[in-house]
């Protein structure tokens, strides 16, 4: 059996790690012993935060909606209840966007929700 020297393979693997570690601080970008665990940890954070991002944005939309419905004499929970009772099925992301970019449209929706609560 012929001998296999691992120079080419090792170089390719290291190059892959260095590419992922680009922009890291200090030895973590140019020493394989420091770069490898740093890249692994970065990937763990990325995986975790892709899940967390969804929660964070939903919380942001809820905060924005709560702030937007207060001038109409509603709280967020009463607003959502009113939407359900009036049969409006628009998600929080779109509602939040409406509240910021189209206040008149959002006001109409808020008034409908308020009317559904009163009825």
From Swiss-Prot:
CDD domains found in the cross-reference section: Ribosomal_L20
Keywords for the protein's UniProt record, in alphabetical order: Ribonucleoprotein, Ribosomal protein, RNA-binding, rRNA-binding
InterPro entries: Ribosomal_bL20, RIBOSOMAL_L20_CS, Ribosomal_protein_bL20_C
GO molecular function: rRNA binding; structural constituent of ribosome
Pfam families, per database record: Ribosomal_L20 (PF00453)
The organism's place on the tree of life at top rank: Bacteria
One Gene Ontology cellular component annotation held by this UniProt entry: ribonucleoprotein complex
One annotated GO biological process: ribosomal large subunit assembly
Family designation: Belongs to the bacterial ribosomal protein bL20 family.
Biological role: Binds directly to 23S ribosomal RNA and is necessary for the in vitro assembly process of the 50S ribosomal subunit. It is not involved in the protein synthesizing functions of that subunit.
Name of this protein: Large ribosomal subunit protein bL20
């Amino acid at each position: 059996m012929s001998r296999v020297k691992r120079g080419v393979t090792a170089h390719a693997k290291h190059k892959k790690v260095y590419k992922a570690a680009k922009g890291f601080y200090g030895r973590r970008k140019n020493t394989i012993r420091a770069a490898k665990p740093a890249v692994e940890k970065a990937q763990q954070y990325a995986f975790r935060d892709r899940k967390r991002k969804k929660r964070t944005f939903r919380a942001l939309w809820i905060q924005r909606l709560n702030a937007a419905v207060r001038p109409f004499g509603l709280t967020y929970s009463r607003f959502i209840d009113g939407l359900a009772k009036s049969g409006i099925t628009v998600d929080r992301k779109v509602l939040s966007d409406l509240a910021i970019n189209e206040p008149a449209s959002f006001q109409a929706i808020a008034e409908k929700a308020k009317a559904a609560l009163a009825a």
